Amino acid sequence: KSLYLILAIDWDGNKKALGFWIKNTESASNWLDVFNELKTRGLEDVLIISCDNLSGISQAIEAVFPQTDVQKCVVHQIRNSLLKVSNKDKKEFVLDMKKIYQAANQEFAMQNLDKFAEKWGQKYPSIIKSWYTNFVELTTFFKYPYELRQAIYTTNLIESMNRIIRKNTKTKGGIQSVNYLSKITYLTLQNASTKWQKVRNWFM
């Protein structure tokens, strides 16, 4: 089963769970259904959505929330890149990657990507291609104030919540019913939400 989880930050900087869905597989079409349901429930004026790089997810977002910015998770991009890098290159490779997403702005990020590509492109062409293909949506966060970028450029909030849910739903009994998984997920979210704090520097 695949868990579809939507966590949000409202205009006051408060974190909220908008909902979760349990489906057989993860796909862009299923995400499209989720976004449509949220819109039907009244969700509107969505400023930005942070997501992973699932094929078709950007198109699903645009179909339902055409004015919304899309931010692909930089951490996912880094992890996927490093899977293809030899151990002897990793330390230097990581330092060069950091110059892209830690640049002062999008223009400098592109300049650093060009240098990155010049240095590593021949050895790791598929990684370089991925960075160029996804560059615009990997660097959306540069449009926002520096103080807020940490809450935008990664899906860490979702990832940490998913780890807790996975731990709580993992049992020795094997596959559990959707009803059981739903109850545990709901209770886990309820418990976690009592500890969520307002995003730091939200009103700066």
Predicted regions and their residues:
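RNase H-like nuclease fold core
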Residues: 1-50, 64-67, 134-137, 157
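Short, charged, low-complexity patches
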Residues: 28-31, 90, 178
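Alpha-helical elements of the RecA-like P-loop NTPase motor core of helicases
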Residues: 29, 55-59, 129
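Acidic/histidine-rich catalytic cores and adjacent linkers
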Residues: 66, 99-204
